[in-house]
Design a protein with these regions (language model features):
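Gram-negative outer-membrane beta-barrel transporters
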Residues: 104-248, 254-256
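Solvent-exposed loop/turn elements at secondary-structure boundaries
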Residues: 1-160
Length: 256
């Protein structure tokens, strides 16, 4: 028996990476929690007009920054696309003649079409390299022209949510199983996986998804490497026993 298929699949991302942008937009934002009895006394009715309370309580809703605009920014590439992969699979099952044994094999290949990654647009390239034996990593000096940030009035990390198409994975599985031989069923399988990507986006926010990436010099290198979620070699098995009784009842005990 042969089986297989191919297709393009689209998914979602953690939506916090979208909400990072409006909440870190570099404009004045204010969270107001009334605790003073004098302020609470003024809030005596519901008002649908969103501009009413900021105008009625100007001391609690500042309209101009006291020093400078907030330094936190999170950006989204105007051409950003939701994650999309091309995936193909092929499988074969072969029943060994005159035995209950079935041999099976499967191959799955996936290729990123629109992978998701974060890029720090406020990162200056390094100006120097270490000169130790076997260690030539980049580093940032202490001179005025060797600043880590392009714009020092902003935070160290200004993440840009964008796409990459460099990731892929290949998984192959072989196995053998028997089904319901005097109530017994069993199987054993081996899987090999090679999976590489630019990033696994290991963070709950845009900045942590960038800064938590493993890298030699800095996460902006965007070098393809082994996926942190890949399991290269895996062996699995199962064993179960089914007993029928009372004409219409059955109990199965399984071990995986």
């Amino acid at each position: 028996q042969l089986r297989g298929g191919t297709g393009i699949f689209t998914g979602n991302i953690p939506f916090v990476w979208f909400t990072n942008m409006p909440t870190n937009a570099g404009v004045i934002q204010n969270t107001f929690e009334p605790v003073s009895s004098s302020v609470l006394a003024k809030i005596d009715h519901f008002e649908a007009d969103p501009n009413f309370w900021p105008n009625a309580l100007p001391e609690n809703f500042p309209k101009t920054p006291s020093t400078k605009a907030p330094g936190g920014l999170a950006l989204i590439d105007p051409d950003f696309k939701m994650p999309q992969i091309w995936r193909s699979n092929f499988g074969v099952d072969f029943k060994v003649p005159s035995t209950p044994l079935v041999l099976t094999g499967d191959v799955i290949y996936s290729k990123d079409l629109n992978g998701v990654m974060q890029y720090n647009v406020n990162r200056n390239p390094a100006t120097q390299k270490l000169a130790y034996s076997g260690d030539n990593r980049d580093y940032w000096g202490s001179s005025a022209n060797a600043k880590f940030n392009k714009n020092t009035s902003l935070n160290n990390i200004v993440p840009l949510l964008t796409n990459t198409d460099e990731g892929y994975s290949l998984s192959a599985t072989i196995g053998a199983n028997i089904n319901n031989v005097r109530g017994f069923s069993a199987g054993v399988f081996y899987s090999y996986t090679e999976s590489k990507d630019i990033t696994g986006n290991p963070g709950s926010s845009a900045s942590s998804a960038w800064s938590n990436n493993y890298s030699v010099n800095d996460p902006n290198e965007s070098l393809i490497g082994l996926s942190q979620y890949a399991v290269p070699n895996r062996v699995g098995g199962n064993l179960s026993y089914r007993v029928e009784y009372a004409g219409f009842l059955a109990t199965t005990i399984g071990l995986y």
